[in-house]
Amino acid sequence: MKKYRIIYADPPWSYYNDSNANPDCTTIKGMRRPPYNVMGSKEIMNLPIKSISAKNCILFIWTTDYHLQKCLEVIKKWGFEYKTVGFAWNKKCCFMGAYTMKSGIELCLLATKGKDAHKLVKKHNIRALIEEKRTKHSKKPDEVRKRIVELMGDIPRIELFARQKTEGWDVWGNEVESDINLT
């Protein structure tokens, strides 16, 4: 199987009872169900990401504050070590949150695999803050992909849970024609 040095993932986190991703479960605090299939954190953790990650690899993975702890567990299970927030997206239009603070941001965490993964970074002046209005539900700004390539160069890369085909990227997901079989 092809090995990637960049893995960019936007898991379809479930806001239901996390023991499963049953769409018939009640959502938290009246949140609407998303217009796509969701996955429980255990299902996300069990994806065979180790089989597609190169010896030295950098993972960019989206999470919300609600799923932050689960995302850190996913990172570890996939064989990576959390390093920092890669990108913070200020949606400039909405404030979400079901428990305490109302947040209009999402985080894209950066994690590494391999003792030389840090050598994959080619530029050190890429801004982490993305300020762009939200469009389609859960669609992340295209600018993030551009900044990842600017940061790391034109190396083998894949977007997991992709919604669109992007030039230079392999993709996997149920909303696109996938370049690999991951399940």
Residue ranges of predicted features:
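Class I S-adenosyl-L-methionine-dependent methyltransferase catalytic core
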Residues: 1-183
